């Protein structure tokens, strides 16, 4: 009985090695943070819209248009 369990354990470890498990650095959240540190433009990533900076003298900040955020302060 014990030898059968040993064989089963060995076969399972050979078919599914522990190195196949994802590491902390492979998590999608970490990859997003790395991508955000790069210079991202909306031309490269259409789903990413860069926040416009439209502060100036006499302008109110932040600005909204039809309840949509359009720009923030510097």
Curated annotation (Swiss-Prot):
Keywords: Acetylcholine receptor inhibiting toxin, Cleavage on pair of basic residues, Disulfide bond, Neurotoxin, Postsynaptic neurotoxin, Secreted, Signal, Toxin
Compartments in which it is found: Secreted
Listed transmembrane segments: none
Tissue: Expressed by the venom duct.
A family per Pfam: Conotoxin
Predominant place of localization: secreted
One GO CC term on file: extracellular region
Prosegment residue ranges: 21-53
GO molecular function, one term: ion channel inhibitor activity
S-S bonds: 54-71, 55-73, 61-74
Posttranslational mods: Three disulfide isomers have been synthesized and tested. SIIID with the disulfide pairing 1-4;2-5;3-6 is the most active.
InterPro entries from the UniProt entry: Conotoxin
Signal peptide (residue range): 1-20
Domain comment in the entry: The cysteine framework is III (CC-C-C-CC). Classified in the M-1 branch, since 1 residue stands between the fourth and the fifth cysteine residues.
Miscellaneous remark of the record: Negative results: SIIID with the disulfide pairing 1-4;2-5;3-6 shows no or very activity on sodium, potassium and calcium currents in rat DRG neurons. It does not show obvious effect on the human alpha-3-beta 4/CHRNA3-CHRNB4 nicotinic acetylcholine receptor.
Family per similarity comment: Belongs to the conotoxin M superfamily.
Function: The short synthetic peptide SIIID (range 54-74, with disulfide pairing 1-4, 2-5 and 3-6) reversibly inhibits human alpha-7/CHRNA7 acetylcholine receptor (IC(50)=880 nM). Shows a paralytic effect in fish.
Name listed for the protein in its UniProt record: Conotoxin SIIID
